[in-house]
């Protein structure tokens, strides 16, 4: 990863720090924001909170990138073809130079050959940006290779400002979703249970930033098609294909009453003249999959399963109309139900074939946030994400 001179992860020890709010790291002084009354009056080391650790790592990386600003900037553009191990040519040189600048490649590796050392460096760079680690610098990799050093610094400084406003205390049981990371984490007793890939809203239908609580789950959910989707996406298809609704196990209501869609002349309908609601019955092809997770919010968004699991293989996953699709959503449901019989409960509910609502014993807090950088404690790595909504200004 980005190589900078740092000491080992610090701990707070009353005998060594004399109850101080700062730690001197080489020539870098880092504010830890630790009140004195949190330091135990014995020699037992006290670990940093997650927020304090994030702030510490941010300062380290800002210092690292600032030291790189004196170096000549390397501007890279996608060459129009994939490069892989075994290739050679002058187009490889600037890529190696950028990897060297970031401390991912040794200085004596500047040859025109794409060797195994370069492949490993590319994989490390891809992991640093949370994209597929295949060692092949394609379009998505070049999206980040083109970043100037100043962008890394600005991203970290914005993150530092946001982190400094946050509090250390969070609910012990928590679902945390970071939109630019396309990731969901579930914690219990402050420990990470599992991380899931997610699909979030498109730029024009953004997933909102919010805090709430998941109250209940619905197995075999019925999908109420939003009006905008009905008139924009479905109406043109219904005009062309009289079997469109039947093929997708859908039905229509008007004023709350189910109507025969075969008797409707959809050619006379428009975005200003569509007095119907469309529903999709619970089924294997239902857009919400096998389960949805409900929480109070003014945006009518929720978490749900999806039959289109192949989309989770993509690096950038802003495909939805605002709701959040979860990979392996039934596994998340098992973790949330938190009983010894959870698998049996889920199997029983799914077997019914119709929507079944299950309330949680205790609501689970959910935070949907937008952070384009994050220190990954499991990987000991600062990761940078694509600013999919352009909010990181």
Where are these regions (language model features)?
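Sec-dependent bacterial lipoprotein signal peptides
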Residues: 1-2
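Well-ordered beta-sheet/strand-loop patches within structured domains
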Residues: 5-36, 40-105, 113-119, 123, ...
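Short, well-structured active-site flanking segments
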Residues: 132-140
């Amino acid at each position: 990863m980005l190589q900078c001179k740092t000491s080992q992860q610090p701990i707070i020890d009353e005998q060594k720090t004399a109850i101080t709010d700062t730690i001197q790291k080489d020539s870098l002084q880092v504010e830890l924001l630790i009140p004195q009354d949190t330091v135990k009056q014995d020699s037992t080391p006290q670990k940093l909170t997650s927020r304090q650790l994030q702030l510490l790592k941010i300062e380290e990386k800002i210092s690292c990138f600032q030291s790189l600003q004196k170096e000549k900037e390397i501007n890279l553009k996608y060459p129009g073809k994939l490069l892989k191990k075994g290739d050679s040519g002058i187009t490889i040189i600037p890529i190696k130079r950028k990897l060297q600048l970031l401390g991912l490649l040794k200085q004596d590796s500047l040859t025109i050959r794409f060797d195994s050392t370069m492949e490993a460096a590319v994989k490390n760079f891809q992991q640093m940006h949370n994209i597929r680690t295949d060692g092949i610098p394609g379009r998505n990799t070049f999206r980040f290779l083109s970043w100037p050093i100043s962008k890394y610094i600005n991203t970290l400084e914005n993150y530092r400002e946001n982190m400094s406003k946050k509090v250390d205390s969070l609910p012990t049981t928590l679902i945390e979703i970071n939109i630019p990371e396309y990731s969901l984490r579930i914690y219990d007793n402050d420990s990470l249970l599992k991380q899931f890939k997610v699909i979030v809203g498109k730029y024009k239908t953004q997933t909102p930033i919010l805090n709430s609580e998941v109250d209940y789950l619905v197995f075999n959910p019925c999908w109420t098609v939003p009006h905008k989707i009905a008139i924009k996406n479905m109406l043109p298809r219904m005009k062309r294909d009289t079997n469109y609704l039947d093929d997708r196990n859908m039905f229509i209501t008007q004023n709350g009453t189910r109507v025969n869609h075969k008797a409707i002349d959809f050619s006379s309908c428009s975005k200003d003249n569509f007095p119907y609601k469309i529903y999709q019955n619970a089924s294997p092809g239902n857009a919400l999959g096998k389960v949805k997770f409900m929480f109070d919010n003014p945006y009518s968004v929720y978490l749900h399963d999806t039959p289109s699991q192949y989309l989770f293989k993509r690096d950038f996953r802003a495909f939805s109309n605002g709701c959040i699709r979860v990979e392996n959503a039934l596994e998340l449901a098992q973790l949330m139900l938190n009983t010894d019989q959870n698998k049996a409960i889920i199997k029983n509910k799914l077997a019914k074939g119709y929507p079944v609502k299950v309330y949680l014993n205790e609501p689970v807090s959910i935070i949907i946030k937008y952070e384009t950088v994050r220190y990954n404690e499991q990987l000991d790595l600062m990761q940078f994400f694509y600013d999919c909504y352009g909010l990181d200004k």
